[in-house]
Amino acid sequence: MSLDAAIKQIQLTIKAASAGTEIKVVKISDEEARISVYAPADNMQAIKDATFQPVMDLLIEGLDVQVFVYDKDNPVATAE
């Protein structure tokens, strides 16, 4: 799978878990990307749960797609 396809897959997973999100993607290399997700606080755990296994599966394939979930109403306080 290409990095672009992996990013698209994770974005669809995020949107399925929480429709009211803002997603920002930064490609770090041909095999690595960082996805920042700004979501309502009530949806943060659902996004983390939904993306955990797909991200692990991508890592096994050699793609490092990191997902960081932030409270869209207070992004600085919830950085993890």
Region roles according to the model:
Residues 59-80:
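A short amphipathic beta-strand at an alpha->beta junction
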Residues 35-49:
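A short interface-forming secondary-structure element
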Residues 15-35:
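Short edge beta-strands and adjacent turn/loop segments
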Residues 1-3, 23-26, 36, 69:
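Charged, low-complexity, helix/coiled-coil-prone segments
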Residues 2-17:
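Short amphipathic alpha-helix segments
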Residues 10-14, 45-63:
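Short, non-transmembrane amphipathic alpha-helical segments
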Residues 29-32, 40-41, 72-75:
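Short, internal active-site loops enriched in acidic
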